[in-house]
Regions:
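Glycine-rich, mobile lid/loop segments that gate access to catalytic sites or pores
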Residues: 1-162, 288, 293-297
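Gly/Pro-rich active-site capping loops and adjacent beta-alpha segments
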Residues: 4-9, 18, 23, 174, ...
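Short glycine/threonine-rich loop-to-helix capping motif typified by GTGT followed
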Residues: 157-173, 229-256, 282-301
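Non-catalytic terminal and connector segments of soluble metabolic enzymes
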Residues: 6, 16, 182, 266, ...
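Hydrophobic alpha-helical scaffolding
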Residues: 39, 111, 115, 119, ...
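Conserved small/polar residues in nucleotide/adenosyl-binding loops
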Residues: 305-312
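Structured core elements
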Residues: 27, 73-75, 91-93, 151-154, ...
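Hydrophobic alpha-helical bundle architecture
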Residues: 179, 186-267
Length: 319
């Protein structure tokens, strides 16, 4: 089904460079220096747990009972000045085969088999999954977060045999926080998947992340949130907002940094599309493990880091 002519009339005005935004709304980009890819350490670790668990399942040599549906959550304790201190809790829920059968048809036998399955999965998470996860972490400050008092919650509801769309309804757009920053930063509410780059729900969110990532990489701030707002049919954003959470390393105010963002980055939808090459067929990777912070991610940090750093070094001298 094609886009409504009423919407398309406002977006496609015949001037390709000034193509209007495909919808109204606010989009957020966030970055911090907690990890090498400028993502919150909580979400980065949760994604690493899931990709590693998938690798183990696909290899088919260990934890051979694994099935595709799984999710994770990592809780980290922070200091008062927002610095990660230690991992408090790791949750891993994974679908699995009925790999331990009950001795008979009684309820007691079924409960005993279910309990043994969960205990085996818990043991394998600690002895197989976690060592492989930690072996992939190169950052000493992230490794230092692991400790002997971590609470591991593995399949906390018990057995998990029925999964995927058969076990729960709906797929697209249900996990917009997992797709972005795991609760840090902000979110305008619009899902990404299923939308082309004329929809600023997707393209402007990628652009805001691109800006935030380059700002942190350039040393402007240890943490930054970039908010863009658009009106349907209008090319330029109606608002650009920046929040450095009091962790800026430059003399400029957040408002002055926002003005610098307007100067440095062309935020018209067509310009975003060109800068980030959003017409290339590269979206398959975003179907799982989030849209941001990927090694092979859509939104990559490019040479903008040097340009941002140069612009900031003159009017906003380091303090």
């Amino acid at each position: 089904h094609e886009q409504s002519d009423d919407i398309n009339r406002g977006v496609d005005n015949g001037d390709a460079e000034n193509q209007g935004a495909g919808d109204q709304g606010m989009m957020f980009g966030y970055a911090c220096n907690e990890t090498d890819n400028y993502m919150p350490v909580t979400l980065d670790l949760a994604h690493l747990l899931m990709t590693t668990l998938a690798d183990i399942r696909k290899e088919g040599k260990q934890m051979t009972y694994l099935r595709p549906d799984s999710k994770s959550q990592v809780t980290v304790e922070y200091s008062d000045d927002n610095i990660p201190q230690r991992i408090d809790t790791i949750v891993v829920s994974t679908q699995h085969d009925d790999f331990i059968k009950p001795a008979d048809d009684s309820r007691e036998a079924q409960l005993k088999a279910d309990k043994e399955m969960v205990e085996q999965i818990h043991k394998d998470v600690l002895e197989i999954l976690m060592p492989r996860v930690k072996a992939q972490i190169t950052s000493e400050k992230v490794l230092a977060l692991f400790n002997d008092n971590i609470k591991y919650l593995v399949n906390p509801t018990g057995k998990f045999v029925i999964g995927g769309p058969h076990g729960d309804t709906g797929l697209t757009g249900r996990k917009i926080i997992v797709d972005t920053y795991g609760g840090k930063g902000g979110h305008g509410g619009g899902a990404f998947s299923g939308k082309d780059s004329s929809k600023v729900d997707r393209s402007a969110a990628y652009a805001a992340r691109y800006i935030a990532k380059n700002m942190v990489a350039a040393g402007v701030s240890d943490e930054i949130l970039v908010q863009l707002a658009y009106a349907i049919g209008v090319a330029e954003p109606v608002s650009v907002y920046v929040n450095t959470y009091g962790r800026s390393h430059v003399k400029a105010t957040d408002g002055e940094i926002a003005e610098m963002v307007k100067k440095l980055f062309d935020l018209r939808p067509k310009a975003i599309e060109k800068t980030l090459k959003l017409r290339q067929p590269m979206y398959l990777e975003t179907a799982a493990y989030g849209h941001m912070g990927r090694q092979n991610e859509v939104v990559k940090k490019r040479s903008e880091e040097r340009r941002v750093g140069k612009e900031c070094s003159e009017p906003c001298r380091s303090r």
